[in-house]
Amino acid sequence: MLEKLETLVSQLKATSSRNDKVSILKSNSWSKEILLRIYNPDILYGVTSKKCKKLNDLDGLKSVDLYDFLTQLVSLSGHDCVRLVNQFVEDFGHEALVHAVVDKNLKCRIDDTVINLAFPGLIPTFNVALAKNYTDHADYVDDDWLASQKLDGVRLVV
C-alpha cells in the first residue's frame, strides 16, 4: 500500500495542473479512504513527525497495514503514538511518506478542494458566509440613526 501511495504522490508532484491532479486522483480510486484519513480535519493524530524524529528510540507497537496504522493512531496518545509511528517506519520503511501522512500533508500540492473535485463530498469543509452590502437590501436606510456599533474585521458564526 505504501508503494502505491508513494507512486500516487510522485505523480501528483510531477504536474502543476489542477485538472491533471483531479484526473490522477479519479483514476486512483483506491486512494479515497487514505485521503479521507489524511486530509479530514475532524480526524486528529496525537503526534507530529517532529516529535517522532526527536524520540526515535521509542518503538514497540505493531501495525499490519496503513489502514490499521491510521486507525490505531487516532485512538492512541502521547508516547504510544510515537512508538507506533517509529515501529511502523522500522517495519515498512518509507520514512518521509509516513511522516508526511502523520503531519496530514503529503506535500504534493493538493488540498480538500482538489480532493472534493475528484471525490465529491469526501472531505468535509466549513466556510464562513460573507456579508453583503446592507444598503442594497434594507428598507430603513433613509431613517435617522443615533449610533451604530462598528465591528471592524470580525467574523462571526451564529
Regions found by a protein language model. Give the residues of each.
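N-terminal nucleic-acid-engaging modules of covalent nucleotidyltransferase systems
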Residues: M1-V158
